[in-house]
């Protein structure tokens, strides 16, 4: 077996590398080239507007495409650029705006992976005769002998917990996992940068992207207001107890768990606990009203060894992560007549519809990823649920 688990020599193994123009995917290409694989670099042009084109680290725009080209020249591998702007707008940007308009907090990186990178680009790699598509994500995959199927693989958290991207990859299907390779899963970010320096790559000191790639300067509201003007319509800021505390300029400016910048001063700390898109209301309350013990999931992607109904029918003990910045905590997954839901042993605050609940075998590095789903709704304390229900059933004043 070679280092990518193929039973043939590296030089007889063709690998397409998804190159964003950043240091991570560039080092992946360098590692595979150094190991003797037949490497092709492909960059997707996903958008081309305003400041994002000239902003280094924005991913898959003008400057980054040029950086990917220069890296491929240094490594001596072919580089291709594919125009996916229309596809990206249709499957990522438009749904992103629609979700915010409905009071959700979407994860565009997941949509991009599932509709562009791990669907369209993966299909292109197969058409080019590649044995695998490699990316610069910090996650691991290994053969899964328990499955009893040749070529079947499982996902695991990476060694570098600070760079763990497994939460964003929960929706990766089993067929995609079997075809993908993640060479950086066993490296730290510092080791990746050291390799980039050693290889003489122009991106060795390039800063990491911190924003949503298609949102210049982090101003996501500009895009949403352009595509979904109704999301910027004014409405009331309402306390859970029914008091109208003030006005807002659009629910798009708020997210569940937010405390700062709410726009009201009452002498008590208040948090956004619900966004009522239909009534154009931002509902606020005390921090204890945020504590969530159960989340209901939609679009579940189960990556366990058995069928979901069999594994979770009587409750499946695992660890759940409901926010990208939070560690996994003890949980139980259920799949029964009430739907698919996760009971959290420790209450979590700031759980928002549209975000993900991702399941693991353990809380630490190298834990297996069991998949997950998008959060459809959540249950809080009995008092908070009752207050919210009563408020939502109350007619909104014209």
Swiss-Prot record:
Reaction equation(s) it catalyzes: S-sulfanyl-L-cysteinyl-[protein] + uridine(34) in tRNA + AH2 + ATP = 2-thiouridine(34) in tRNA + L-cysteinyl-[protein] + A + AMP + diphosphate + H(+)
EC numbers for this chain: 2.8.1.13
Main subcellular localisation: cytoplasm
Keyword check for Iron-sulfur: no
CDD domains tied to this protein: MnmA_TRMU-like (cd01998)
Record site: Interaction with tRNA: 137, 355
Region: Interaction with tRNA, residue numbers: 163-165
GO MF entries: ATP binding; tRNA binding; tRNA-uridine 2-sulfurtransferase activity
GO cellular component, one term: cytoplasm
Subcellular location: Cytoplasm
Alphabetical list of SUPFAM superfamilies matching this protein: Adenine nucleotide alpha hydrolases-like (SSF52402)
Pfam families, per database record: tRNA_Me_trans (PF03054), tRNA_Me_trans_C (PF20258), tRNA_Me_trans_M (PF20259)
Keywords of this entry: ATP-binding, Cytoplasm, Disulfide bond, Nucleotide-binding, RNA-binding, Transferase, tRNA processing, tRNA-binding
Active site: 112 (nucleophile), 213 (cysteine persulfide intermediate)
Enzyme class (EC, first level): transferase
Protein residues bound to ATP: 18-25, 44, 136
Domain of life: Bacteria
UniProt family annotation: Belongs to the MnmA/TRMU family.
Protein name as catalogued: tRNA-specific 2-thiouridylase MnmA
Species assigned in the record: Agrobacterium fabrum (strain C58 / ATCC 33970)
